[in-house]
């Protein structure tokens, strides 16, 4: 059974290891995953997280959801769910599961994502850049189509 752990601004993300807290609870034990906000309930906690795939079900670029609350920035009142690639090549162990974003999409984020250019970020998402997008951070509004530097 999978469970969710709360991380990055307090939003639930799918976890493949560790122990469960209240964010992993569900109303019945018949559900196989709580990766989606709609399946997170208040009872029947699972003690461990064993699921390694399937967390991306129902994800997509865009699409607003009312789950969660406004982050510390207070800039947005809704959240966008998406599937992010596995960014472990850049040193983070976060799984490629559904997450709830804390920022609006940008070209340096998931739409043009390539796993080899991922950078870890906050709020459970990853900043992912095209192969030769040489912006130093994902807060830049424009991505470079080609590299002027030998290493991106």
From Swiss-Prot:
- What UniProt keywords apply to this chain's record, in alphabetical order? Acetylation, Keratin, Repeat
One Pfam family named in its UniProt record: Keratin_B2
Entry superkingdom: Eukaryota
Give the modified residues of type N-acetylalanine: 2
Repeat sequence: residue ranges? 27-36, 37-46, 47-56
UniProt key word Repeat: yes
Any one cellular component term from GO for this entry?
cytosol
Give any extra note attached to this record.
The source of this keratin is lincoln wool.
> What is the protein's known function?
The keratin products of mammalian epidermal derivatives such as wool and hair consist of microfibrils embedded in a rigid matrix of other proteins. The matrix proteins include the high-sulfur and high-tyrosine keratins, having molecular weights of 6-20 kDa, whereas the microfibrils contain the larger, low-sulfur keratins (40-56 kDa).
Q: What protein does this entry describe?
A: Keratin, high-sulfur matrix protein, B2C
Organism from which the protein derives: Ovis aries
